Amino acid sequence: SGTLLASLRDNNTLKTPITTPGAAVSTAEEALLASAEDDNGTSYYFRGAVTNNYVEFANKCWRIVRVGGDGSVKLILHNDNTAGVANPCSSANNSTDAAFARYSGTTYTSAFNANYNDNAYIGFMYGQAGASDYASAHANTNKSTILTNLETWYNNNLESYESKLADTIW
């Protein structure tokens, strides 16, 4: 009572997915809250064309993906609220470019890595370009462009909320 999970359960009927999670894409008719056991108890997840899983946090609009058995809430960014409006989840404020790295149909607006001419550059972090062995090329030594950008965004937008963030496996 009084928790986000209690509100989700009070306002949604638990249903069995029409399609098999992990094996099939949800159908247009599938919009539900389902449950499954995880390592920490019962988790709840939204699946399909759900319209009531929006939540405001850190002056941004997020969509609830899952509530883990430990009570942690997994969110994805819906609207970055760069305009700073009072209600970032209002449909009038939906952003067409909220994603941190958005695919435009031909390119991403943020490069994964500005460097590209060596297979060392394929990781989130990378090692030494031109290295003669795999371990040196793929060591976690240097940050990719996307990791640097993501860390900057986190520091500017979420770092002050760190006490409310769960460090858990997605």
PLM regions: where:
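Long, domain-scale functional regions
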Residues: 1-170
